Regions:
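Conserved HGGG/HGGXW glycine-rich cap/lid loop of the alpha/beta-hydrolase fold
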Residues: 52-99
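Catalytic histidine-centered segment of alpha/beta-hydrolase-like enzymes
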Residues: 287-300
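Conserved acidic catalytic loop of the alpha/beta-hydrolase fold
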Residues: 109-127
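Conserved loop-alpha-helix segment in the C-terminal half of the alpha/beta-hydrolase fold
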Residues: 249-287
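Conserved alpha/beta-hydrolase catalytic His-Asp/Glu region
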Residues: 187-247
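Flexible "cap/lid" loop of the alpha/beta hydrolase fold
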Residues: 148-183
């Protein structure tokens, strides 16, 4: 009896961690059994592109989460482009982006290398970098390499209290991803049904009805053409985020949703803050793990507050340097 009681918490944690895969399987099974056509129109297929660039101002880079594409940032793009030259690439090995080079094993460092190359090709040296989930982890690795003017993270991956639980979470995500990838050819049919959108998006967002059906269909199709995801999720928990020294010239804001059902703050946010000393924490109410569609205005505001402050400090430093004989301006565009 004693052994059974001690096992029960672990079993419960593993069950909850693999819930996304179970939800995905249930949705697909129910969809196959339903015969009546849904009343909603089939969303038009969205063409695949490797990146997005628009707006003007200081450079701002947006990095999405595992299995996604740059399109997850669409709700906030108009709000950010008023102040910044926005560059949103799809991560290497994801739908529409370049694959990892032959012989390169999937890892956080390999993805960070690929994103750094994307920035080089786009002519971006240092930029404000914003990341969600996996994109947040990559943003921190780019900051470690000196590529960040500032960093804003929404539910960043990379740290955890329990390696066993995080491995179970990654396994659940991988199984869910593999399952939905088999349905890529039916993406539009799945996305047009409100009940499947609500079921499949329940762990990702707080307000599934705010997600455009066409965008949801595009995300399902992307899963069928993202070869890096499954092997990455097999190994992602082997090397957690390393300690990132504080830098007063590179502000970091960590935003954590109060409804994050993928990587909750208590289990993942607190250990991440221990690895990123000096980071500012903001708790965001009423949104899920991917908050851009839940509350685009709040997300944009939390980004622009940081970039505006960093840009002003940068300009002040440049002005002070220009008044000092022989001094060189700090930073680069």
């Amino acid at each position: 009896m004693t052994g059974r009681r001690s096992d029960r918490p672990l079993i419960w944690r593993l069950t909850r961690a693999t819930l996304p895969a179970a939800v995905g399987a249930a949705a697909v099974a129910l969809l196959r059994r339903r015969r009546r056509p849904a009343p909603e129109a089939v969303p038009e297929a969205i063409p695949v592109t490797p990146s997005y660039a628009g707006g003007s101002g200081t450079p701002l880079v947006l990095l999405h989460g595992v299995g996604g594409t740059w399109r997850v940032w669409r709700p906030v793009l108009p709000l950010l482009e008023r102040r910044h030259a926005v560059f949103a690439p799809t991560l290497p090995g994801h739908c529409g982006a370049e694959r990892l080079a032959a012989g390169v094993a999937p890892s956080i460092h390999a993805l960070a290398d690929g994103v750094a190359e994307q920035l080089d090709r786009a002519g971006i040296d240092r930029a404000h970098i914003v990341g969600n989930s996996l994109g947040g982890w990559i943003a921190l690795e780019l900051a470690r390499r000196g590529r960040a003017r500032s960093v804003v993270l929404f539910g960043p991956a990379g740290a955890w209290r329990s390696a066993a639980r995080m491995t179970a979470v990654a396994t659940g995500m991988r199984l869910s991803f593999v399952l939905l990838a088999t349905q890529a050819g039916r993406a539009e049919a799945i996305a047009r049904r409100r009940w499947t959108r609500r079921l499949l998006l329940a762990t990702q967002v707080e307000h599934p009805d705010r997600v455009d059906p066409a965008e949801f269909a595009a995300s399902i199709r992307a899963m069928g053409d993202s070869p890096v995801v499954a092997p990455l999720l097999r190994v992602i928990t082997k090397n957690p985020l390393e300690h990132l020294p504080a830098d007063p010239d590179r502000p970091i804001r960590v935003v954590w949703a109060d409804r994050d059902r993928v990587i909750p703050f208590e289990r993942n946010g607190l250990p991440l803050l221990e690895r990123v000393p000096g980071a500012e924490l903001v708790r965001l109410a009423g949104v899920g793990h991917v908050p851009m569609s839940d509350d685009p205005e709040q997300v944009a505001r939390l980004i622009l507050e940081v970039t505006r402050t960093a840009d002003r400090a940068h300009e002040k430093d440049r002005g002070a340097s220009s008044m000092t004989p022989g001094a060189q301006p700090r930073g680069a565009s």
